[in-house]
Amino acid sequence: MALCNGDSKPENAGGDLKDGCHHYEGAVVILDAGAQYGKVIDRRVRELFVQSEIFPLETPAFAIKEQGFRAIIISGGPNSVYAEDAPWFDPAIFTIGKPVLGICYGMQMMNKVFGGTVHKKSVREDGVFNISMDNTCSLFRGLQKEEIVLLTHGDSVDKVADGFKVVARSGNIVAGIANESKKLYGVQFHPEVGLTENGKVILKNFLYDIAGCSGNFTVQNRELECIREIKEKVGTSKVLVLLSGGVDSTVCTALLNRALNQDQVIAVHIDNGFMRKRESQSVEEALKKLGIQVKVINAAHSFYNGTTTLPISDEDRTPRKRISKTLNMTTSPEEKRKIIGDTFVKIANEVIGEMSLKPEEVFLAQGTLRPDLIESASLVASGKAELIKTHHNDTELIRKLREEGKVIEPLKDFHKDEVRILGRELDLPEELVSRHPFPGPGLAIRVICAEEPYICKDFPETNNILKIVADFSASVKKPHTLLQRVKACTTEEDQEKLMEITSQHSLNAFLLPIKTVGVQGDCRSYSYVCGISSKDEPDWESLIFLARLIPRMCHNINRVVYIFGPPVKEPPTDVTPTFLTTGVLSTLRQADFEAHNILRESGYAGKISQMPVILTPLHFDRDPLQKQPSCQRSVVIRTFITSDFMTGVPATPGNEIPVEVVLKMVTEIKKIPGISRIMYDLTSKPPGTTEWE
């Protein structure tokens, strides 16, 4: 069989196969095609007591066979199988007699190798969907004929390869194929993530029933492994740990304290000016109770005026650099994160100097988690993952320190829920372990900074599509070319649901002139936000349905919000100039305080994984004839429920959170001077990330 996607085999193909000296009898190899969820597959397999190892997609088939792997799982990825830059792989992996499960991109690879075709279709699927399954197929044994799964793809199988049959469908789209005699299976959805309700059953069927794994691999004691790693790397040196007070950095510090002598650990909390109300004070008090002495540094001024070096442009491949604007004049989310991350390191170096320590003898410790590295496309996590957003603890400067071996990240293979379990094993108090996550850059990435509106050429047409969707029951009576596009992108079931919703409720749907970061098809997207308003009381189930449907039809939208209050008559087309100034931050800080205080008092904080409160530069309810300038801002409440922060869903008012709790938040936030409207984020992940930036 010929080599695929490349004229010759890459020089390093198979070179990362653990030096070729290991034997993995009974284990599963995960070939990494660059999916954001690659490490989640590894984790899910190990949860089922089967050993798994992650190797590059280009690993040759003979190496996999020689190493004794029992089965192969191919991850998803951001590429198209027909793209010129599609990653190379050895097609013989499908013919060495090993059971193969191809996920998303992996399924498309499998189909193409055996003569099938893959096309980029008009319908993009990003979110949770009901799909039909053939539950007589070994992979789906024990499941219902309809299951809820996560789909996130633009390319779809068109012609199914000879010898394969379709075993799952999402409407008219192929969602699963199988050649049972050869034990080759492909699924377009992601069984590894929590949003696929019975994904674990599918993986168990593959591992046990199809591949014949024994399930005798038990996970090592992670705490002891972390402590061993810290001792081995640090020796007698000092470690500077940057403490935010959140669960990640606190567990990291507790591990350092357990592994090293107390005088080796220097715990520093840097108040960057973007903390929540009274945050630094409460952090210091909480950690003192744990016996951890913390040096608190007020560095707000340094951060507000911080800069970093950046490439001349995104297209410039030369090493030439430019100095960024100061943080308080920067609007780019990526540049904000990079400035904040590099300023953290600069201040850490200043602390080292003030304490008369030798920089070459001091390590920097961080509570970096696996999702941080995956979303930053760090090689530590995945060789091919597409950049979603730069994390403040995985900037270019941090990566340089990491290459020099100067960064300690004992939690780099952990997900959030695993860190909480580890924290309990370390006897940390429950109130600290169960805290909602708060990003290191703090409120800085919860302010949507902008000088001008985000309006591209597709703005008017997209707005017209949204009008058709919001008034679908009336639109079907007036044939329009865009109506045909809407119908082409939706199933009959979707259209029936749209008819029902729009005939019962009076809705407006329109674009907001701002952009937020999302993840669509394993790639980063900076896209529009769709706003929905209504004169009726919100029907939350219907709104959640629309939030799933709209990004599927309009690929330039990655987030949908409901706007509280009367119908929006004139959607804003300009923005209030917004930067990271003290006044802007004070407004958001108060809104965040009010919302979280109400959530805590309601007793529902434990039901919600995280609740970012976002300040946007949008001023509603202005009469265009009076030409009133945009001077107010609006707040978004982003409830989020997840087990691993790789995928998740919003809390539906009336289900996971009482409607009256949400309305109380709206009432209290509206009292803050300068607030125009309150919005509720209806978006799952994907297509929207947890944070807006």
UniProtKB/Swiss-Prot annotation:
Positions of XMP binding: 337, 522, 610, 685, 691
Cofactor (UniProt): Mg(2+)
Modification sites for Phosphothreonine: 318
Protein name from the UniProt record: GMP synthase [glutamine-hydrolyzing]
Tissue: Expressed in the testis, brain, thymus and ovary.
Cell location: Cytoplasm, Cytosol
Positions bearing N-acetylalanine: 2
A GO CC annotation given for this chain: cytosol
Keyword terms: Acetylation, ATP-binding, Cytoplasm, Glutamine amidotransferase, GMP biosynthesis, Ligase, Nucleotide-binding, Phosphoprotein, Purine biosynthesis
pH dependence: Optimum pH is 7.8-8.0.
Main location: cytoplasm
EC assignment: 6.3.5.2
MF terms in GO: ATP binding; enzyme binding; GMP synthase (glutamine-hydrolyzing) activity; GMP synthase activity
